[in-house]
Amino acid sequence: MEAKKIIITGGATRIGSAIAKSLAGYDVDIVIHFNKSKKSAQQLKMELEEMGTKVYLIKADLSNVNQVKKIVPFAYKKMKGLDCLINNASLFEKDDLENFNDKSFSKHLDINLKAPAFLIKDFKRYVRNKEANIINIIDQRVKKLTPFFFSYTLSKAALATLTTTTAMKLAPNIRVNGISPGPTLKNKRQSE
């Protein structure tokens, strides 16, 4: 992928941080979105800038559509263009059929599905007829279903469908792909 003007949601930690590091370079601009990981975002910014990358940070709560709608215009203004959107941010909280609730279910859908949908919509508007890439980070759970992490799994399955339908709609200029990583090291909120 030869992207030079990249947006990465949830780019400050874990997979997002690894993606940013792998795409960094002298002629690359990256907008790193974060919500609660300001310190990690600032540290990553310094690391990437040492590699010659121009880095811009934006804080946004992806469960708030008004904040979501500020990300693409901010990125376009800072980078003077766009050619790649990586929808990496996600909410991953344990629940199941017996104990899920409206608040958690809605928040999973807002962050893991609704935010990427609005970001894709805005990205397409700014890219117009240029060639570009959209990458949605899905999850291997979508292909290997279990009854655990109920709200998360349903939201990621919907993101997989969003990926397929937007790929059909935006082809051939904008290529849309999904990546479904397997297990990663646990985060501080997860148990063994």
Predicted regions, residues:
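Catalytic loop of short-chain dehydrogenase/reductase
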Residues: 133-171, 183-186
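The beta1-alpha1 cofactor-binding region of Rossmann-like NAD(H)/NADP(H)-dependent oxidoreductases
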Residues: 38, 59-70, 102
